[in-house]
A protein has these predicted regions:
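Polytopic transmembrane helical bundles with strong interfacial aromatic enrichment
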Residues: 1-299
Length: 299
């Protein structure tokens, strides 16, 4: 086993420790109302357990970071996978610092899910070590990316604190215009969070199923001199195609819940690399997220 493979194991360990830390914070906050319990003693005990488990998760995450650095020979912030893993680690560092100051278990109940979400989102991206472009092989990459992520991490903890505050002070039973406006914005924020969770879950589910669809897309480009060039490329989908690429034909498509062919074609004005696949991913995320949010509202 080389350093990069070992770092992947440490990353998985960090993810599960963060999940357990979150569950223990929930027990610390919600469990104080259980019968035959001293609420203050219960909160203190489980908050300490949650903090220790979360700190162990951070230790495993730091192990991932430095062992991947050793194995790759470069600081692991050079692609989206590495940056998002570093951002998750930075958020955890920020939480550890803020929690050491204020010692509020409810902050852990809101911050840990954010860390889990970022870490899970990182796993969506390719995990191979990629060599740095020579222009980026500079000390400024280490300084700029890491300090930017650390700054964003404290904003992330502030977001968790702000959301916690809003859920506490907004009057969800109020009928005034001001109360209804506050309710709508809080619900919109929660809806966006659920859609992001749905995106990550959908990617993992279809990836686990091994789903794949392929299209051949014909692209026509006219340069400044009026010369027309046509290129044909293959586009692969990891989710059932609700929207197929513009001006494309199906090469291979597995049926899913009766969906044996794309329902729509991506509009021609949507340009960019893999525009159709990105639109399809957004639509799936909104559909699944809306379903999850509707179920949560029913509960």
């Amino acid at each position: 086993m080389n350093w990069v493979e070992f770092s992947s194991d440490a990353f998985i360990a960090a993810f599960f420790l963060y999940c357990f830390g979150f569950m223990f914070y929930v027990i610390a906050v919600a469990g104080k109302k259980w019968s035959n319990r001293d609420p203050e003693r219960h909160v203190k005990r489980w908050a300490r357990i949650a903090y220790i488990v979360s700190a162990l998760g951070l230790l495993a995450h730091l192990t991932f970071f430095f062992t991947r650095w050793i194995g790759s020979g470069q600081i692991p912030t050079s692609n989206m996978y590495e940056f998002m893993t570093f951002l998750g680690m930075a958020i955890m560092i920020a939480f550890i610092i803020v929690n050491a100051i204020y010692r509020k278990p409810v902050l852990g109940m809101f911050s840990l899910p954010l860390v889990v979400l970022i870490v899970a989102y990182a796993s969506v991206f390719p995990q191979e070590v990629q060599p740095l472009v020579p222009a980026l092989n500079s000390i400024w990459l280490k300084i700029h990316v890491t300090t930017a992520a650390l700054g964003e991490a404290f904003f992330a903890v502030a977001f968790a604190s702000g959301l916690m505050y809003l859920l506490r002070v907004v009057d969800f039973k109020g009928t005034s215009k001001k109360a209804r406006r506050a309710q709508r914005w809080v619900e919109f924020t929660l809806y966006v969070i659920v859609v992001i969770i749905a995106f990550i879950a959908t990617v993992f589910v279809f990836r686990g199923m091994g789903y794949q669809a392929s299209f051949t897309q014909e692209l026509v480009n006219i340069d400044s001199r009026g010369v027309e060039t046509t290129t044909v490329q293959e586009v692969d989908y990891g989710m059932p195609p609700i929207f197929k690429p513009y001006n494309s034909e199906v090469v291979e498509m597995e049926s899913f819940l009766g969906l044996s062919k794309p329902l729509f074609e991506t509009p021609s004005w949507m340009e960019g690399v893999n525009a159709g696949r990105k639109l399809n991913t957004i639509v799936w995320s909104i559909l699944v997220g809306s379903l999850l949010y509707g179920l949560l509202r029913l509960v």
